[in-house]
């Protein structure tokens, strides 16, 4: 971008501020002393305007939002007549919406299956499919699976493993592979 374009968009020192922005600045100015307000740049003032707008939007939506720090200093009544001295969230530093993440977890149960946690703790559990830890051999449990274990094994979300591992684990008999020789090798 050309640097001249940025200069054109910036308001000049002696230029008029739009009426809407001036009203927003006046709403924010009451929270600062005259010296603080004069020292602030226009960008800082705009940031405070947006902070106040976001706070008002959150409270209108029904969230229990805390006052922004600059609004706590004066504790003046806002334009709607609400007294900030009576705000129960005045001393809190963190915003707490009505539906926190912990409450959402209570409403919506975890999606992760419980079976993997049991396998790690249970020594009789169904062993994993062949892999480097058991030297390529497929292990089977000593007894048959009961119906509840079969249901837990087949139902539920996928665990991110390969699609064929489920089928390999349920085979009843071991498959033995033989080498098929070429007819040319047999002639020798």
From Swiss-Prot:
GO terms for biological process: regulation of DNA-templated transcription. Residues 78-188 are annotated as: Disordered. It holds the Pfam family SSXRD. It comes from the Eukaryota. Residues 112-122 have a biased composition (Basic and acidic residues). InterPro entries: aKRAB, KRAB, KRAB_dom_sf, SSXRD_motif. Signal peptide: none annotated. Keywords: Transcription, Transcription regulation. The keyword Transcription regulation applies. One of its GO terms (cellular component) is nucleus. Residues 144-155 have a biased composition (Polar residues). Residues 179-188 have a biased composition (Acidic residues). The keyword Transcription applies. Residues 156-170 have a biased composition (Basic residues). Residues 20-83 form the KRAB-related domain. Belongs to the SSX family. Could act as a modulator of transcription. This is Protein SSX5. It comes from Homo sapiens.
